[in-house]
């Protein structure tokens, strides 16, 4: 109660855990987009301004795969062009390695290559335009 804004970051575990799922359980880019759109619609129906974040890279993590990276890219492209939300914070652009965009830049990468380290979390925090949340 009382929330006016929400920042949604969704999808990376749905991509990664597919290695353990049966073919019928695997999420496609369209599945993830539909799930995110549903969450956005639910929040907006409650009068909440919604902001999305792009999914950060995860190459080097045990559940990285090329098909999973393709899904991440497709969903991120949709997020970046989404007109149903109040804004987008591009965490992918903030922390990716320019030489290898499927990987988090070493300075920001946690030990598992999926999560950020303290400097990485600081970097994504700095990439949020706080004026949009006022």
Regions found by a protein language model. Give the residues of each.
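Structured catalytic/translocation cores of nucleotide/phosphate-coupled proteins
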Residues: 5-8, 32-40, 51, 117-124, ...
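N-terminal/domain-start segments enriched in small and hydrophobic, helix-friendly residues
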Residues: 37-53, 63-67
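Alpha-helix N-cap and loop-to-helix initiation/capping positions
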Residues: 23-31, 35, 63-71
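Alpha-helical scaffolding segments of alpha/beta enzyme cores, especially the outer helices
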Residues: 31-41, 45, 74-78
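Catalytic His-Asp segment of secreted/periplasmic serine-dependent ester chemistry enzymes
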Residues: 16-18, 55-134
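Surface-exposed acidic, glycine-flexible loop patches that form ligand/cofactor-binding
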Residues: 1-2, 41-42, 46, 133-134
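Structural recognition of the beta-strand scaffold that forms the well-ordered cores
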Residues: 4-10, 48-54, 87-90, 115
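Oxyanion-hole/transition-state-stabilizing segment in secreted/luminal serine hydrolases
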Residues: 1-30
């Amino acid at each position: 109660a009382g929330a006016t804004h929400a920042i949604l970051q969704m999808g990376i575990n749905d991509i990664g855990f597919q290695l353990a799922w049966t073919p019928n359980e695997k999420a496609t880019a369209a599945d993830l987009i539909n799930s995110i759109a549903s969450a956005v619609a639910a929040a907006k129906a409650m009068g909440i301004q919604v902001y999305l974040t792009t999914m950060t890279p995860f190459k080097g993590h045990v559940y990285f795969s090329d098909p999973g990276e393709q899904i991440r890219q497709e969903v991120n492209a949709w997020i970046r062009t989404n007109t149903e939300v109040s804004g987008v914070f591009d965490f992918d652009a903030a922390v990716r390695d320019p030489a290898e965009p499927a990987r988090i830049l070493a300075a920001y990468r946690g030990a598992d290559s999926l999560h950020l380290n303290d400097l990485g979390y600081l970097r994504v925090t700095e990439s949020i335009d706080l004026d949009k949340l006022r």
